[in-house]
């Protein structure tokens, strides 16, 4: 496993009362905080129940400390909440957690890795744009079969570009159809916006390849994670990125009714729980 910041895996994440502890996560398109807390997605993590109760809540407790989830509309807001103690821990995909750790040189964060069943990401469209979704799906199929999605993942997520992704040039085609797609920058380096407000990273590079295959103009529209559903339903954008698709049979917290999705374009099976180090 890749070396984590300061070569430390968390031995004791956080001591809290047995009655409640709060977990920060990015807003989902198809769930309220209450619904998310009731389902407790952390229960899907392999062996998580005992591990979380002993590591996060402290040993010798009753085991009734079910987490309460709090949604944040952006990664920045979620990090600020962790810094000021509004939440006990935050959860992120492994690649986001590693990005945060690399960009936290003072080593003030601690992490524990949970194994989950695979979670995948897809592009989401309204049902009335199902034909457009189908075209994007065919492009993704081609890019998967020819190895391009794997190549981009190695370069932008696992490679040196993950530290500070550069903006990607997206080819424009005169007179061609324009497809507006929301980019949030809230799950770097997969979905990333640089300090100057320019989208970059894996998603941008992937969209450039899709635009080239389909001969369409990709227009990137900036917005926060919490704005994805509203932007899609209002028609501000034609598609949103990183719709989180859970394994079959599990609750779909991020896929509202009336939304269709492409085949997966990225996936992972590790979740990072991150807390602040005690002073």
Which ranges hold each PLM region?
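Sec-dependent N-terminal signal peptides
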Residues: 4-14
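Flexible hinge/capping segments at coil-to-helix
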Residues: 32-41, 263, 274-279
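Extended ligand-binding regions for polar small-molecule ligands
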Residues: 28-30, 50-51, 56, 117-163, ...
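Sec/Tat signal peptide C-region and signal peptidase I cleavage site
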Residues: 14-20
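Periplasmic-binding protein-like
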Residues: 28, 102-137, 175, 185-186, ...
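Disordered inhibitory propeptide/activation segment of secreted metzincin zinc metalloprotease zymogens
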Residues: 151-181
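Extracytoplasmic small-molecule ligand-binding "clamshell" domains
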Residues: 21-84, 89, 93, 174-250
């Amino acid at each position: 496993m890749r070396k984590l910041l300061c070569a430390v895996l968390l031995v004791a994440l956080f001591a809290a009362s047995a009655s409640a502890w709060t977990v920060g996560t990015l807003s989902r398109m198809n769930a309220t905080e209450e619904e998310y807390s009731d389902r407790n997605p952390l229960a899907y993590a392999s062996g998580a129940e005992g591990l979380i109760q002993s590591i996060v809540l402290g040993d010798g407790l009753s085991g009734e400390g079910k987490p309460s989830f709090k949604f944040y509309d952006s990664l920045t807001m979620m990090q600020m909440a962790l810094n000021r103690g509004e939440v006990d821990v935050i959860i992120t995909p492994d690649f986001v957690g590693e990005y945060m750790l690399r960009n936290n040189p003072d080593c003030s964060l601690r992490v524990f890795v949970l194994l989950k069943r695979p979670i995948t990401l897809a592009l989401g469209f309204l049902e009335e744009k199902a034909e457009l979704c189908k075209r994007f799906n065919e492009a993704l199929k081609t890019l998967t079969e020819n190895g391009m999605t794997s190549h981009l993942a190695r370069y932008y997520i696992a490679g040196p570009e993950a530290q500070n992704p550069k903006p990607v040039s997206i080819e424009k085609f005169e007179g061609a159809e324009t497809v507006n797609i929301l980019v949030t920058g809230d799950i770097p380096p997969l979905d990333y916006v640089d300090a100057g407000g320019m989208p970059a990273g894996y998603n941008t590079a992937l969209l450039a390849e899709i635009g080239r295959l389909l001969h369409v103009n990709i227009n990137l529209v900036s917005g926060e994670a919490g704005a994805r559903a509203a932007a899609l339903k209002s028609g501000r954008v034609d598609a949103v990125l990183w719709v989180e698709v859970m394994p079959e049979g599990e609750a779909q917290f991020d896929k509202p009714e009336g939304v269709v999705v492409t085949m997966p374009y990225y996936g992972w099976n590790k979740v990072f729980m991150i807390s602040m180090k005690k002073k």
